[in-house]
C-alpha cells in the first residue's frame, strides 16, 4: 500500500509539473521597421469604427497644425506632436489620418507610432504627454487651426498609469467627441484617436490593440 501511495504521489507531482504554465517571455524592444506595419490602413480602420473610411493620408514626421489658448491642454488636443515625439533617440516614426471622405469627418481617426533607440527615450516621450497635461482635465479651451478655423473643446481624463494614458475631448455644443489613448510599450510610444458622435472608446481601444499587436515584442 505504501508503494501504491508513493506511485500516486509521484503521478500527482508529475501532473502538477506538466500543467504549470510557463512563465511569460520578457518583452523585447521593437525594431524601427515596425512603424511600417503598426499604422492600420483605412480598410482596417473602417472595420474597427464601423464606418466606411474612403480617404486617408500618411505622414512620416511629427507635426502640429494648431495652437490652444490654454497651453496645459496642448498635448491632449491632438496626437503625433513634435513636442511629444521629437527626441535625438527617435529611430523611426509613422502616422496616418483616415476619414469617411476628403470632406466628411463624421468618423475621423488618427494614428501615430514612434520607435526609440532606448526604452528610456520612449519613456521620456510618454512623460511629455502625461506630465505636461496635468491640470487639463476639466478645462475648456479654444483650438485655433492652421486653416483659420477655431474649435472649442472640453477635456476630461483619468490619471495616467505608468504606461497608459487616456482622455476625451468634446466639442462645445455638440455630441462630437474624440477618444484618445497613448501607450508606452518598451521602446515604442503609440497613440490612437477616434472622433465621432457618441462613444468611441471601444473603437480606440481596439485600434490601439491592433497597433500594439504588430510591435513584435
Where are these regions (language model features)?
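N-terminal "mature-domain start" segment
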Residues: 26-98
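Short, surface-exposed coil-to-beta transition loops
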Residues: 107-110, 174-180
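Short, surface-exposed beta-strand/loop micro-motifs that present aromatic residues
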Residues: 94-101, 177-185
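Surface-exposed amphipathic alpha-helical segments
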Residues: 193-217
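A short acidic-to-branched-hydrophobic micro-motif
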Residues: 95-127
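Secretory targeting and sorting signals
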Residues: 1-27
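Short Gly/Thr-rich strand-loop-strand
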Residues: 54-56, 60-64, 131-176
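Short, well-ordered beta-strand elements
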Residues: 109-112, 183-196
Amino acid at each position: 500500500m505504501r508503494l501504491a501511495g508513493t506511485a500516486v504521489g509521484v503521478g500527482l507531482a508529475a501532473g502538477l509539473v506538466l500543467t504549470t504554465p510557463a512563465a511569460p517571455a520578457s518583452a523585447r524592444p521593437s525594431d524601427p521597421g515596425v512603424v511600417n506595419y503598426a499604422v492600420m490602413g483605412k480598410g482596417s480602420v473602417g472595420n474597427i469604427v464601423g464606418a466606411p473610411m474612403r480617404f486617408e493620408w500618411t505622414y512620416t514626421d511629427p507635426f502640429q497644425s494648431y495652437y490652444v489658448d490654454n497651453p496645459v491642454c496642448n498635448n491632449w488636443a491632438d496626437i503625433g506632436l513634435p513636442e511629444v515625439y521629437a527626441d535625438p533617440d527617435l529611430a523611426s516614426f509613422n502616422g496616418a489620418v483616415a476619414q469617411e471622405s476628403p470632406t466628411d469627418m463624421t468618423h475621423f481617426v488618427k494614428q501615430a507610432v514612434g520607435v526609440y533607440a532606448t526604452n528610456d527615450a520612449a519613456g521620456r516621450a510618454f512623460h511629455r504627454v502625461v506630465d505636461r497635461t496635468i491640470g487639463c482635465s476639466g478645462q475648456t479651451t479654444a483650438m485655433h487651426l492652421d486653416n483659420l478655423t477655431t474649435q472649442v473643446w472640453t477635456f476630461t481624463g483619468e490619471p495616467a498609469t505608468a504606461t497608459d494614458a487616456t482622455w476625451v475631448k468634446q466639442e462645445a455644443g455638440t455630441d462630437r467627441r474624440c477618444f484618445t489613448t497613448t501607450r508606452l510599450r518598451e521602446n515604442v510610444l503609440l497613440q490612437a484617436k477616434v472622433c465621432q458622435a457618441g462613444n468611441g472608446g471601444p473603437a480606440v481601444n481596439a485600434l490601439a490593440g491592433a497597433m500594439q499587436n504588430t510591435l513584435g515584442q
